[in-house]
Amino acid sequence: MAGDKQNLQDAFLNHVRKGKVPVTIFLINGVKLQGVITWFDNFCVLLRRDGQSQLVYKHAISTIMPGQPISLYEGED
């Protein structure tokens, strides 16, 4: 059912969060942040590194790169 499908952004963020995949986040001002995503909602992402948490607003994010290859494709069309 189309209503049950998750959007790509949420699927990606949930995958790296559940797998505790290290990510690099580039902000629109060029700042690079690294850590593990522990939580997210429609407006922000919580990034954890070395026991410290950073709340990053999504409107400030340019790119999120996982530290390892990931596959979101589950074989369904």
From Swiss-Prot:
It comes from the Bacteria. SUPFAM superfamilies: Sm-like ribonucleoproteins. One of its GO terms (biological process) is regulation of RNA stability. The keyword RNA-binding applies. GO terms for molecular function: RNA binding. Belongs to the Hfq family. RNA chaperone that binds small regulatory RNA (sRNAs) and mRNAs to facilitate mRNA translational regulation in response to envelope stress, environmental stress and changes in metabolite concentrations. Also binds with high specificity to tRNAs. Homohexamer. This is RNA-binding protein Hfq. It comes from Paracoccus denitrificans (strain Pd 1222).
